[in-house]
């Protein structure tokens, strides 16, 4: 399921959002563990060339800074802005010059060893709107692929 929407407040554009949800036959704790190990599978996205970070301990923690290099060579300075273990949700902020990104990922337990993977990516401000006007198709494809790669990695943790 994919949504592409604009968020407005008092008629003023705030950001363009890409929202994707996927129901998977994976226990919720495994899906959450896979998300927490995103540093392993993020480089597998076709839109990414690499993920660089200081290997000092746990990757998945609030305040963790890292760089994601796109296949086009753009380096996004990223930070795990918040981690909500109780609700199995993270928020990541990233930027490259004037381009800013807000990414939220969440796992929802549906019972019977099934869960929903959710990813929402937004690009705030007019610069984000201009960026998505040119790169919207790429971003919507990445949104879907992100959940597929996350799911595939989670399946490797089942064994």
PLM feature segments, named:
Residues 95-145:
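Beta-strand/loop substructures that line and gate deep hydrophobic ligand-binding cavities in soluble
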Residues 40, 44, 83-88, 122:
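Eukaryotic helix-grip
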Residues 26, 72-74, 123-125:
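Beta-strand elements of well-folded, non-transmembrane domains
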Residues 24, 40, 81, 91, ...:
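Hydrophobic small-molecule pocket/channel-lining residues, especially in calycin-type beta-barrels
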Residues 3-56:
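Hydrophobic ligand-binding cavity/cleft-lining segments
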Residues 17-19, 73-78, 99-104:
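Short, surface-exposed coil-to-beta transition loops
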Residues 25-29, 81-88, 106-116:
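A short, structured loop/turn motif at beta-sheet edges
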Residues 52-96, 149-157:
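Glycine-rich portal/gate segments that line the openings of hydrophobic small-molecule binding cavities
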């Amino acid at each position: 399921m994919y949504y592409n929407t604009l968020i407005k407040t008092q008629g003023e554009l705030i950001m363009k959002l890409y929202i994707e949800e996927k129901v998977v036959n994976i226990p919720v704790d495994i899906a959450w563990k896979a998300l927490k190990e995103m540093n392993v599978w993020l480089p597998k996205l076709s839109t990414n060339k690499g993920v660089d970070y200081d290997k000092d301990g746990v990757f998945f923690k609030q305040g963790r800074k890292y760089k994601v290099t796109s296949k086009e060579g753009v380096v996004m300075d990223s930070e795990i802005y918040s981690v909500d273990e109780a609700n199995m949700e993270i928020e990541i902020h990233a930027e490259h010059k004037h381009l800013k990104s807000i990414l939220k990922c969440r796992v929802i337990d549906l019972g019977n060893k099934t869960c929903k993977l959710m990813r929402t990516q937004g690009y705030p401000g007019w610069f984000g709107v201009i960026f998505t006007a040119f790169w919207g198709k790429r971003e919507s494809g990445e949104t879907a692929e992100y959940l597929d790669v996350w799911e595939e990695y989670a399946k490797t943790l089942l064994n």
